[in-house]
Regions:
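Membrane-anchoring hydrophobic helices of lipid-metabolizing enzymes
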Residues: 1-86, 93-95, 102-106, 122
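Non-catalytic C-terminal accessory region of glycerolipid acyltransferases
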Residues: 2-9, 142-273
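Structural motif
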Residues: 81-83, 127, 160-162
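Flexible, glycine/proline-enriched loop segments at strand-loop-helix junctions
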Residues: 85, 131-140, 171-176
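Gly/Ser/Thr-rich loops at beta-strand to alpha-helix junctions
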Residues: 86-90, 167-168
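Short amphipathic alpha-helical face segments that pack within enzyme cores
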Residues: 91-98, 184-187
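Glycine-rich, phosphate-binding/catalytic loops in enzymes
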Residues: 98-101, 177-179
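Conserved nucleotide-cofactor-binding alpha/beta core module
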Residues: 107-142, 146-147
Length: 273
């Protein structure tokens, strides 16, 4: 496993412009907090996924307050699915692995290929590519990811989804919220017919991150490492919802109807009493 999440060789392969400009790449890494990401990964890559994720919050001096976590304690052995909003883009994925992974070590999360660069968490990830429709090779990655996800659940293991497939964005009502949950993800849930647990992450990234997303999603993506390390001494609030049975979901016959239902169930957890 590579010690770095992203290094100079990775960058020059992705962008030939940087060939022979290692000093410039290092300056960019420092500006974007990629150097901090690489340092954390190199020091902790030996840890299993839940411990690797938990230690990140410890090093940030952040606390995680989980409401209704007893739901996870009462889940019987066997497969289930979690669905969550996606306000952070990185820390919510790590928090999910921390929270659910400490209850079930076989828990995996479906993520974008970008997060799959975190080598220490690859055993906990099933990667797909958000731009799969643009490239046959990327489509193959996504097809494999979907196949792996379905096999994982059918073999009796739990799986986490961020059904929006992208980080939450600013709405016309000036709220930061997920886009419509993607029918492709909801179809998987419909086919698997296992219990679903909604998990809501309170809060969001900085307004700089949000504004960059309105310009170009790639600019927002470059900002992700900074958005991890600017969360020092924060309280992260997470609300776990009650289990939704396959029978309850069966009354919603289309992916759009079920997606709207599951999203509403998740956002109903937003109020923190």
């Amino acid at each position: 496993m590579k010690r770095a999440v992203l290094d100079y060789d990775d960058v020059r392969k992705m962008a030939p412009f940087f060939e022979g400009k290692e000093k410039l790449v290092n300056r960019v890494f420092h500006w974007l907090a990629v150097d901090k990401t690489n340092d954390y990964h190199s020091r902790n890559m030996h840890l299993p996924g839940p411990e690797f994720s938990h230690k990140m919050f410890d090093e940030l001096g952040a606390t995680m307050t989980i409401r209704n976590e007893e739901v996870l304690n009462s889940i019987p052995e066997g497969p289930f699915i979690t669905v969550s909003n996606h306000p952070y883009g990185a820390l919510d994925g790590m928090a999910l692995i921390d929270i659910v992974g400490h209850h079930r070590s076989d828990f995996k999360v479906m993520v974008n290929m970008i997060l799959n660069h975190i080598g220490a968490l690859r055993p906990n990830f099933i990667a797909v590519d958000a731009l799969a429709s643009d490239d046959p090779a990327k489509r193959a990655v996504s097809v494999k990811g979907i196949t792996d996800a379905m096999r994982h659940v059918k073999q009796g293991h739990p799986l986490g989804f961020f059904p929006a497939g992208a980080v939450s964005k600013l709405t016309w009502g000036l709220r930061i919220e997920d886009r419509e949950w993607q029918p492709s993800v909801i179809r998987i849930i419909q086919k698997l017919k296992v219990p679903v647990i909604p998990i809501y992450f309170h809060g969001h990234n900085s307004w700089v991150f949000t504004m960059l997303g309105m310009i170009d999603w790639r600019l927002r993506t470059l900002r992700l490492p900074t958005e991890v390390f600017n969360k020092t001494n924060r309280e992260f609030r997470v609300s776990v919802g009650n289990v939704i049975s396959p029978e309850e979901m069966a009354q919603y016959t289309t992916p759009e109807e079920l997606g709207a239902f599951l999203k509403q169930k998740t956002y109903n957890l937003k109020k923190w009493l």
